[in-house]
Curated annotation (Swiss-Prot):
Organism of derivation: Chelativorans sp. (strain BNC1)
GO molecular function: ATP binding; tRNA dimethylallyltransferase activity
Feature type site, description Interaction with substrate tRNA: 101, 123
Gene responsible for this protein: miaA
Protein name: tRNA dimethylallyltransferase
Gene3D superfamilies: 1.10.20.140, P-loop containing nucleotide triphosphate hydrolases
Binding site for substrate: 12-17
Source taxonomy: Bacteria, Pseudomonadati, Pseudomonadota, Alphaproteobacteria, Hyphomicrobiales
Key words of the record: ATP-binding, Magnesium, Nucleotide-binding, Transferase, tRNA processing
Binding-site positions, ATP: 10-17
Family listed: Belongs to the IPP transferase family.
Amino acid sequence: MLKGATLIAGPTASGKSALALQMARERDGVIVNADSMQVYSVLHLLTARPGPEELAMAPHRLYGHVPPSKPYSTGRWISDVRELIEAEALARRAVIFVGGTGLYFRALTEGLSPMPEIPEAVRIRWRKRLAEEGGEALHRLLGEADPLAASRIRPSDSQRIVRALEVVEASGRPISYWQGQASHPLVDMTSCRKIVLMPDRNTLASRIEKRFDQMLRHGAVEEVKQLLALDLPPSMPAMKAIGVREISAVLAGEISLDEAGSRAIAATRQYAKRQITWFRHQLGPDWEHMPV
């Protein structure tokens, strides 16, 4: 178990990475990514991963280490964090977890039940069926295979529906069985500091707009070209990064770059709003809610 860690959560563009870097430089620390999109190798600009200058200032872990062709889950992230701890890659350093994926922080502080390995063929088959049949049809199938899971998952939540169906097929047991297994946190709750940044709405909106404009100027279009060249299914998580769909439409001649920017900025604002709502309701009073 990791002692004395710092956890920094917050919505996109709230200044999390800058705060983490400041702390790491002051305390000879190492920064560990807790953002589900910043794990992907091709998506550097669109996910606002730290650049070369930031990477040179402090050690960074679990950034850009996953090919976008590979699915990546909360369970995989926890496994990667556990490997870092067991390999003593974080030993004798101030460890700072930073990101906007609330489920990662929940798993880190509350534990995550073990899940079975899902064969790649099973993943491909269910993602193909999702693309062909749609989420509502698969939700009906889940109602037959795992009624309890179906009652807990909205018909519109296609990612969780597919995950539950994959688990049933791969293990022969419903996902609720695995979720009921014992789990343990990876950080010592008595010695860690937990911070969630809560930015002013107008300030955040301005930051989001400015940041996406910078992404476009620095090569986001070329980044999307590289991603599209991989010919990935639209259901892959990396393909759902904000900006990918919008810039893809530009490359297809469907909309202008200005229109793509407007749409991506609006989508980012909506995403930040959902993040803030989640943090307010899911992160308890033991978290420092820090205005920025």
